[in-house]
Amino acid sequence: MKHFLTLRDFSKEEILSLVNHASELKKEPKKLLQDKTLAMIFEKNSTRTRMAFELAITELGGKALFLSSNDLQLSRGEPVKDTARVIGAMVDFVMMRVNKHETLLEFARYSKAPVINALSELYHPTQVLGDLLTIKEWNKMQNGIAKVAFIGDSNNMCNSWLIAAAILGFEFSIAIPKNYKISPEIWEFAMKQALISGAKISLSHDRFEALKDKDVVITDTWVSMGEENEKERKIKEFEGFMIDEKAMSVANKDAILLHCLPAYRGYEVSEEIFEKHADVIFEEARNRLYVVKALLCFLDNQRGRE
């Protein structure tokens, strides 16, 4: 069964097809999943992700079932595989926002319904789909190639974008602090994919080096959920990595800024630059709705072929 746990399980053609279908559904809504049910399991708080998934399945003609960790016997020690067997047999899709990626993998092994990663500590693939739709809409993809820079933490967003860029053949530069590392296994996968796709990928510890000649600039919060007690340390480590006027001046003249939100002005991005690119950033957030619609339809079609 086809799940959506990471973009590395999808081909270039499948990823682009999802983005194109999302664009079509944005222009012309259709009720393609009449009476289908989506279970939404949250171990972490969410604003945009919950709204995108709940609205997506509703507007497609289905219904959503919200389940926090407190609603499930998982919080009392029930094995993940048992919960997966029950929920996966009752619904058509399962969306999960989890603390550990291993929870997703275990759930997917035993679920009879396709499982979607709505965020783990390793990956955030639905966000990247939304980013890709936004890049398409702002005409920042020339001949199928975008020039993208990611500035910030070597986190789930960085990992997901690295994989996407490698599969799609993009020019992609990363800038992270010196004591931060990309997962060796994820980096190796990306390098192998880049050889196939022709992607040009680079890693540095200098934001200006990464930003040079880029059309798309991506950043993310420096302090992720669950890292609040590390805030002071991380702010010191990320000194010099803010996306401000000086940083954006190194990118191409009409470069756009993307941020998955929530944004913390004065840290990863300046107030002035955030507001300058607010139209793009909030359309990026809205685009999550349409890529989720396309993803649900894709998984439903895949399941129908089995």
From Swiss-Prot:
Task: Provide the organism lineage as a comma list.
Answer: Bacteria, Pseudomonadati, Campylobacterota, Epsilonproteobacteria, Campylobacterales
Organism, per UniProt?
A: Campylobacter jejuni (strain RM1221)
Q: Which GO terms describe its molecular function?
A: amino acid binding; ornithine carbamoyltransferase activity
Question: PROSITE patterns, from UniProt?
Answer: CARBAMOYLTRANSFERASE
Tell me the name of the encoding gene. argF
Q: Which PANTHER family match?
A: ORNITHINE CARBAMOYLTRANSFERASE, MITOCHONDRIAL (PTHR45753), ORNITHINE TRANSCARBAMYLASE, MITOCHONDRIAL (PTHR45753:SF3)
Q: Which reaction does it catalyse?
A: carbamoyl phosphate + L-ornithine = L-citrulline + phosphate + H(+)
Provide a GO biological process annotation: L-arginine biosynthetic process
Alphabetic keyword roster: Amino-acid biosynthesis, Arginine biosynthesis, Cytoplasm, Transferase
Q: Give residues annotated as binding carbamoyl phosphate.
A: 46-49, 73, 97, 124-127, 260-261, 288
Q: Where does the chain bind L-ornithine? A: 156, 220, 224-225
Name assigned to this protein: Ornithine carbamoyltransferase
- A single GO CC term, please? cytoplasm
